[in-house]
Amino acid sequence: MDGVSFSVAPGEIVGVIGPNGSGKTTLFNSILGQIKPTSGRMRFMGEDITGMSPLALSRRGVGRTFQTLQVFGSLSLRDNLIVAAQEFVRGMPSRLFAAPDAGLGAQADAMIALFGLERVAHLPAGSLSYGQQKLADIAMAFMPRPRLVLLDEPCAGVNPGLVDGLRELLLHLNKTQGGSFVVIEHNMDFIMRLCPRVICMVEGKVLAEGAPEAVRSNPAVLEAYLGN
């Protein structure tokens, strides 16, 4: 990445688009401490988080999803949600070894109902379809009620007929939990309908930033992202 600089306001939803290799995932991994930047700084709620570990970020209220699903196949979907919330307080080992916290059961049940996963809530997550695991993975990111959520390709693997429903879910969570979202997504229509502000990256740089229609109609974006 080179010269990438932007801010996200409390409660704001920002979309990041761009062709493969544009630096979107590198951006996420840098924020999450998976990659240490060679220069530049990142700040969250006034604190310098450059190079901070994923656990430390989680405890400061940063949630995330990755392209690789984070569900534990041997645990029920419901228990996956509960231990995801425990990570915020106790750290990553709790996701593997801690007994489920009964006090989080009601919160998990509410999230399961919101995502329409009641029928599979008590099944091992590994037995669910990819789309169901994807929804569970997204739900897990919201269990600790984070202040900032980084969503990497939330539409990937989701039935096209459910994409609009996923958008409504994210808007609902944004309204009810009040956190900020940064969303990476190849589905431009999804981003344009979800995010009031869109950033287009190309070759590690910000090519365009602004309102959805302004970015969509930018000739440089059309050439770089759509190949026209």
Outline where the language-model segments fall.
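Helix-to-loop junction immediately C-terminal to a conserved catalytic motif
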Residues: 32
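Catalytic Walker B motif of ABC-type/P-loop ATPase nucleotide-binding domains
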Residues: 149-153
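The feature captures the beta-strand-to-loop junction immediately N-terminal to the Walker
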Residues: 17-19
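Conserved ABC transporter NBD signature motif
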Residues: 40-47, 60
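Conserved ABC ATPase "signature" region
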Residues: 89, 94-120, 161, 168-171
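Conserved catalytic motifs of ABC-family nucleotide-binding domains
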Residues: 145
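Conserved ABC nucleotide-binding domain
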Residues: 50-51, 111-129
